[in-house]
Amino acid sequence: MNTIQPDDWAMHDTGAAPTAEVEGAVAAPVPIEGIRGKLTNQAPLAKLVWFKSGGAADWLFEPADLDDLKTFLARLDGDLPVMALGLGSNLIIRDGGVPGVVIKLGKAFASVETHDDYTVTCGAGAHGVLVASTARDAGIAGLEFMRGIPGTIGGFVRMNAGAYGRETRDVLIDCDVVLPGGSFVTLPVADLQYTYRHSALPDGAVVVSARLQGEPGDPEIIGAEMERVAEAREQSQPVRTKTGGSTFKNPPGKKAWELVDAAGCRGLTMGGAQVSEKHTNFLINVDGATSADIEGLGEEVKRRVYAHSGVELEWEIQRVGRP
């Protein structure tokens, strides 16, 4: 693994990539002069995702701030794939690693601010728990459900994350996005064309912040609802395991976990992966599972559910990278 800091290289920005040589003739994906973030070649990703499995990113970029991110994407070869990585839930990183560039947003993108009109402005790197708690302290209701979703606002916006009867589209006003090429745009919620666990955000777009609409509320009542959400999650889900969250989308009028259970998959194993005994719509890494174990188990569950009920389950967990 090689970490490049901009001061390590004397080079000129010609607008073409690559121009820098890194150890072993590995070329940096952009001219790095003036880039202030951290750029790492062959960066292990397993430690950054909840399943604790998977390969490395060809490149991992951790921008110093918004301007740094815009500069980086403006210089990046448009043919290279770009993926934003949040908290690492809802994600399988395949064992062969991720091509192109993975972008990890840090503290500069994790702020949360409340406003007198009961709106909340939050960075894409802010955790759902922080957003809900900050809103509670300001007497802003309507965001309690985010307490029960593992992830960051950037991921919530991209996939229309939801829980306990509420979804991101119910509270999102708009979001700020850096597009491939480095342009900065604000997209109103209508432009995202939300459906169940899906948005129309273009590939390679990086959400950097979002504005959410709440409503007046009593902090004590809001706090009690957040505690209820947290307790419900603790009681029903394997939250203290290496898991990725809900594995399959709920088919219309049905619950995925019931279909999985009816097909006899509770406790089913493949390699070091297992269908949770506690909640059958969760896969868990119980014994050094590879990502191939986890994804393979999910595919086997899909096969058995279809054979039993005729319903074809759809993955909710994102699966990225090379096998």
UniProtKB/Swiss-Prot annotation:
GO MF annotations in UniProt: FAD binding; UDP-N-acetylmuramate dehydrogenase activity
Any one biological process term the GO annotation gives: peptidoglycan biosynthetic process
Coiled coil stretches, renumbered: none
Pfam families per record: FAD_binding_4, MurB_C
UniProt keywords, alphabetically: Cell cycle, Cell division, Cell shape, Cell wall biogenesis/degradation, Cytoplasm, FAD, Flavoprotein, NADP, Oxidoreductase, Peptidoglycan synthesis
Composition bias, Polar residues: 235-249
Record region (Disordered): 234-253
UniProt pathway: Cell wall biogenesis; peptidoglycan biosynthesis
Catalytic center residues: R197, S246 (proton donor), E316
Major location (coarse): cytoplasm
Cofactor(s) essential for the protein: FAD
Highest taxon of the lineage: Bacteria
Function as written in the Swiss-Prot or TrEMBL entry: Cell wall formation.
Entry protein name: UDP-N-acetylenolpyruvoylglucosamine reductase
Source organism of this protein record: Erythrobacter litoralis (strain HTCC2594)
Lineage: Bacteria, Pseudomonadati, Pseudomonadota, Alphaproteobacteria, Sphingomonadales
Name of the gene: murB
